[in-house]
Structures are given as C-alpha cells and as structure tokens.
UniProtKB/Swiss-Prot annotation:
Its EC number is 6.1.1.14. It comes from Solidesulfovibrio magneticus (strain ATCC 700980 / DSM 13731 / RS-1) (Desulfovibrio magneticus). It is found in: Cytoplasm. GO terms for molecular function: arginine-tRNA ligase activity; ATP binding; glycine-tRNA ligase activity. Coiled coil: none annotated. The lineage of its organism: Bacteria, Pseudomonadati, Thermodesulfobacteriota, Desulfovibrionia, Desulfovibrionales. Keywords: Aminoacyl-tRNA synthetase, ATP-binding, Cytoplasm, Ligase, Nucleotide-binding, Protein biosynthesis. InterPro entries: DALR_anticod-bd, Gly-tRNA-synth_bsu, Gly-tRNA-synth_heterodimer. It catalyses: tRNA(Gly) + glycine + ATP = glycyl-tRNA(Gly) + AMP + diphosphate. GO terms for cellular component: cytosol. Belongs to the class-II aminoacyl-tRNA synthetase family. This is Glycine--tRNA ligase beta subunit. GO terms for biological process: arginyl-tRNA aminoacylation; glycyl-tRNA aminoacylation. Tetramer of two alpha and two beta subunits.
Length: 697
C-alpha cells in the first residue's frame, strides 16, 4: 500500500471556514477514490489557517481490475445469414476497444444479444490522483469566495502552493499557474520554509519540527486549554473558557501559545458580563475567575508563535485591552446616570418592524401579554412582576453599552433594571428574555423569565404572520422557526399548561388597531399550522418515530406540555410487542367513524341506548365502556397518559369481539346508529390520546 498526501497552501483562511473544509475534503476524496476503484484505508484531513491537508496512508497502488459483460445489439442485426459479423457487430466491438472476434451471443430476458467481456481498471493510482486533486480544489465550498489577480477561479482565500505526493513521487498537475510539487511552508515567522518533503510519510515530522506547525486542530485546542488552565491556576483562579472562543482561536493559529496579562482592578466595578464580552469579542481573550465566581484582574490571550520579547508583547496586549475596558467603563457609568423613563421615551423612536410600531409599543404589548400568560398558566402570584418585566424588556436597546455590545441585550437590561430599583424577579426575567438562543441553548431558569420569553416570541410571530412575513423555504430572516421552537421548549421544560390557541390569540389581539395584511382569523390558523410543523420537527429530532409523533399531534397539540407527556406515553405503548395488533383494532374503529361521521343523516353523539343493544358482543362492549370510561376520564384529566393507554388492554378484547360478531352497518337504521354511537363514544376518548387512524402498521 502507498501513502498519498495532498496539501493546499493559502493565505489566512477565516477560522469559521476550517471545520467545514475538513469534512468536505474527506468526503470528496472518499467519493473520488471509490468512483476510481482505488482501494484505501482511513482518510484523514487537517486544517490550519494556511493549509488544508489530506492524508491517505493506505492507498492501493492501482485501481481494481474488474471484468464486466457489456451487451450490444440484437443477434439478428449482429450477424448475417452466413454467420459473419455485420457492421453493427464490428462497430460495437470497436466502441469497446476490442476486436470483433471477442463478440459472443448472450441470452437475456429480452432475447439473444451480442456481448463482450471487458476488463476495466488497473490504472496506476498516480495516473488517477491528478484529476482527483483538481476536482477537489474546484468543488470545495466556502461561505464566501474571492478572486485575486486576473484569475477567473474563486476560492476562500488566494492559493499559493500545492504539495502532492504518492510515497516519494510527485503527483503532477497544474491549476491555473500553480504547479504541484514537494515543497511546503511552515509558520510564517518561526519556520517559514520552503521545505522539501522527500516522502508523504515524512511530511508530518517536517511540518512540525521545521515548520513549527501544529497540524491537528484537536491538538491545538488541547494546547490552548491546558496552557490557559495552567496560567490561570498560577494566577490563583480558573480560566473562563467559552467553547466558541476556544474553537475560534484554535482556528486562528498554527502554533498556539497562551499569554497571561493583567489589567487595573478598578475595572472590576464593571459587571462581569461586560468585562468578559469585551475580552472575548475585541481581544479574543479568556477571563479568569476566583473560587467565588468573581473575576480576577487578569486575562489570557492566544498568540500564534513564541514571542521574541514576551514582556513587550504582554505590555502591548495590556495596553490595547485597557483601552477597551476604559470604553466599557465609560458606557457603564453613562448608562447608570440615565433613567428608565428616559430610555422608555427613546424607545418611541426605535422601530420594531415597519408597520408594527415602535419598540415602546412592543414593550406595552409585552407588559399586557405577560400578565395574560401568567393568568392562563395558573400562576397569578407572578403576574405583576412578569408584567413589569414585559414593560422593561426592551429599555436596554437604547443604552450605550448595548449600542457597543449588541450581544449583551437583555443581560444589560436585567442589570440596569435591578440597579435602578426594579424587583429581582422582574430584572432576572428581563435578562433571560432571549433564551433559548438556539437548539442547544438553555431555557430561562425562572418562571417570570419563561413567561417573558414566550411573550416576546409570540408577539414577534403574531406581527410577522400578520404582515404575511411567514418563513418560505430556507428563508427565515426574522428567525420565526427558532422563535416557535423556543416557545415549545420553554413550555415543555417548565411544564406550563398553556393553551396555544389562547396564547396566540392574545398576541394577535395585542396589536389592537395595527393594520395586518392578513385577516386576523387566518393569522391564527396559519400560526397554529406553523406550530404543528415545528412540533413535529422538534419531537422527531428528539428521536420519536414520525408516525407516533403524527398520531399524538393528530389528537391535539394546543396544550404543548400535555402533548409532550402524551407522546412519551404513546412511544412507550408503541414499544410493546402487541402494539401492532392493538393499533389495528382501534384504528378500525377510528376509520369507521371517520367514514360514517353521520349515521343515517343524523350526527353521531356517542350516546348509546341500552334498549337497542341486541347482540351479546355489543352488550359486553357497552358494559366494559361504562366501567372503563370514568377511570379513563379521571386518569386523562390527571395527565397520567401511561395509565390511560393501559386501559386500552381492558377494552381491546371486547372491541375485537364486537367486530367479529356484530354487523355495524346493519339494515335497521336505529340499530346501526346505536352501534355507530357506541364506537363513537370509544373513538372520542381514544382520539384525546392519539389519532389511531394515522398509525400505519
């Protein structure tokens, strides 16, 4: 087996591009080698800011040889009456690169046809690899591409070299004016190169020892983490490591070195969140905290090389960070001198969305809607403070701090509200209003925060749908899918018993005289359908079977917390060995009622007349229903859906016997209607748990 190595060298690539490039280049070479029939072992890929590397240490020297039978024209046109090959046979053989003497006749389901046995493959790997390298370079995708010089070709950043080796041989190709070779380049300062690489296997030692490049991103990340933790410990604290920032600095350096710097303790009067954000966003630096969670006046930054003069570099970083912290301190002090009333007044000039009023209008809607949600959820004790939080929710949008650090919106609102005399509960809710910020983000920890989060998202959804701005395809500029999913998660994780229809109607009503482009009754219907789609996506993403999710949604989904509990119980029911047979029984009943919604022109009510029960099986079913239904209703109202589904095992034998021995659609219309009503009473209760007709077994 041979060792293949391919390196694309380029100018500094944005850190966010690198993980995708690693995955994509592995996939491109895996597909290309498979298509070329070149066997290989594991394909590894690595990326730094200046290079993308593919390594295939176990590559076959040549493509597999395979014999295939190629069919041609029918026998009757391939040979003449004397049995001699015709022009058609000769053309067929020539087209396959073989002599006509190799043609034979093959029996097929369609008759007798000319055929050839053809051997393919066997090409040397070094002959196939140039095309694969070129194809990979052309197909790599980037969030943004650029052109340079007079080239028509676009790439993530300008390309400077290609290293391509199969063992000790150069894989020859040229792209634009760049020719592949055996030269590589190292870290710009510590090991610039070029370095000649004699073999593919030698590349890794050369790039590390001479080029001073740590190729593996996982190793670079480990270096940053371990050095940061060690330096923080020496300073008497613990590094505050943001995973996103750790990934970013890992992608910004080829030879990471962590440096500890210090700043004036006077800046510790500024809130922790502000200091950390300033360090992370402007200086790509980590904060250090003490054992009580308070920040220490030190920071950790990641360099891309070992500095020649450590103290000079440290002073430079400290000087730059100090300037940033001075700005943050100025914003903090300026904001503390402003009043909430002044900010509320300024919000009148901040547009929420064109046609939906100002941010002050939104704050008033949230104040009202938070109170409604607290009342609907049966949480009157939190109603006042939740409403207060709604009114304060957007005040920090006009603060100097949020003007500089937009990512602190909400967080600063909570801090400022508390500093300006608002309750701890309301202030905490303001700080949590934007949670969850994504699928992996936590939901608000407090009840008031949960209510404000729901209200804020519901208000945005109602307004956008009212202006006919629902998401279409992949386009979702206002993150409405995330907003709906956020509401679902908050409701489920807090166990809030909210009626989704009432919630959304309350949000729609909050817009008062605002003119919608869509009729308000249609807005509600579209929103409910939208939530149904989001709930399906959410629960299937949680691992639930699609049919089980659809069955649970088919019963009802306006009580999201109850839906989650019903779905969990239904999934447990579906895992039982006799699930399929039970479903068939109750699905049959559901299908009959679906088709016979009106019996003999009379709407079915579920009311059964005992005097019309004639067959023993229908009498038995009526008796079992009379016994089970009160327990069913009590358990359902208590939310014990697992116990509700267990009752189906008590019902099923009588239902099976009913279908085996009773003619539902009999000639006697009164009796038919009574039997349909008996099934209706059963299906109505089953339908509160799941739409059994939607289950396919």
């Amino acid at each position: 087996m041979s060792h293949f190595l391919f390196e694309i060298g380029f100018e500094e690539m944005p850190a966010r591009f690198l993980p995708g490039l690693v995955d994509e280049v592995k996939k491109l070479f895996a597909e290309g080698l498979t298509q070329a029939k070149v066997d290989c072992g594991t394909i590894a890929a690595f990326a730094t800011p200046r290079r993308l590397v593919v390594s295939v240490p176990d590559l076959a020297a040549a493509a597999r040889r395979e014999e295939e039978v190629v069919s041609g024209p029918p026998e009757k046109v391939g040979f003449d009456a004397a049995g001699a090959p015709t022009k058609a046979a000769e053309g067929f053989a020539k087209g396959q690169g073989l002599d006509v003497s190799a043609v034979f006749v093959m029996d097929t389901p369609k008759g007798r046809y000319l055929a050839l046995r053809k051997t393919t493959g066997g090409e040397a790997a070094i002959e196939l690899l140039p095309a694969l390298c070129l194809e990979a370079v052309k197909k790599l995708s980037f969030p943004k591409r650029m052109r340079w010089g007079s080239r028509e070709f676009a790439f993530g950043r300008p390309v400077h070299w290609f290293l391509a080796l199969l063992d000790d041989a150069v894989v020859p190709f040229q792209f634009d004016d760049i020719t592949s070779g055996r030269a590589t380049y190292g870290q710009r300062i510590m090991g610039p190169g070029p370095f000649e690489v004699p073999t593919a296997a030698a590349y890794f030692d050369i790039i590390r020892d001479k080029g001073k490049v740590v190729l593996d991103a996982r190793e670079r990340e480990g270096i940053v983490r371990s050095q940061a933790e060690a330096l923080a410990k020496e300073a008497g604290g613990t590094a505050v490591i943001n995973p996103a920032l750790l990934a970013e600095v890992t992608g910004l350096t080829e030879h990471p070195v962590v440096l500890l710097g210090r700043f004036d303790p006077k800046f510790l009067d500024v809130p922790r969140e502000v200091l950390i954000t300033s360090m992370e966003s402007h200086q790509k630096s980590f904060a250090v905290e003490d054992g009580k969670g308070g920040l220490l006046p030190v920071f950790l930054t990641t360099l891309g090389l070992v500095p020649g003069n450590v103290e000079l570099v440290r002073r430079g970083w400290q000087r730059v960070l100090t300037a940033r912290l001075e700005d943050a301190r100025f914003f903090w002090e300026a904001d503390l001198s402003a009043s909430l009333e002044t900010w509320q007044k300024k919000l009148e000039n901040v547009v929420f969305l064109a046609g939906l009023g100002s941010m002050r209008d939104k704050g008033k809607r949230l104040e009202r809607l938070c109170g409604l949600i607290a009342e609907q959820a049966g949480k009157p004790e939190i109603m006042l403070e939740a409403s207060q939080a709604g009114g304060l929710a957007k005040v920090d949008l006009v603060s100097d701090m949020v003007g500089e650090f937009a990512e602190l919106q909400g967080i600063m609102g909570g801090i400022y509200s508390r500093r300006k005399g608002q309750s701890k509960t309301a202030s905490r809710a303001v700080a949590e209003q934007y949670l969850p910020a994504g699928p992996d983000s936590p939901v608000p920890a407090t009840l008031a925060g949960a209510i404000l989060s729901i209200a804020d998202k519901a208000d945005t959804l109602a307004g956008c749908f009212g202006l006919d701005m629902a998401p279409t395809g992949a386009a979702d500029p206002y993150a409405l899918r995330r907003a709906a999913l956020g509401i679902c998660r908050v409701v489920i994780e807090h166990g809030l018993r909210l009626d989704l229809m009432e919630l959304l109607q309350g949000a729609i009503d909050g817009y008062g005289e605002v003119k919608f482009k869509v009729d308000r009754t249609h807005v509600l219907a579209k929103l409910l359908d939208f939530f149904g789609q989001r709930l399906k996506a959410y629960f299937t993403g949680q691992g639930y079977d699609t049919l089980v999710v659809e069955a649970a949604l088919g019963a009802s989904y306006t009580d999201i917390a109850a839906l989650s509990a019903r779905l969990s119980a239904l999934a447990g029911f579906a895992a039982k060995p006799d699930f399929d047979q039970a479903v068939l029984t109750f699905k049959r009943a559901a299908n009959i009622i679906r088709k016979q919604g009106v019996g003999a022109g009379v709407p079915l009510t579920g009311a059964v007349k005992a005097a019309l029960l004639e067959e023993q099986a229908e009498k038995d079913l009526a008796a079992v229903c009379q016994d089970v239904f009160p327990r069913f209703d009590a358990l359902f109202d208590a939310g014990d859906y697992g116990a509700v589904l267990e009752l189906l095992y008590e019902l099923r034998p009588s239902v099976d016997a009913f279908f085996d021995n009773v003619m539902v659609m009999c000639d006697d219309m009164d009796m038919r209607l009574n039997r349909l009503n008996l099934l209706k009473s059963l299906v109505d209760r089953l339908g509160r748990v799941a739409d059994f007709a939607a289950l396919q077994v």
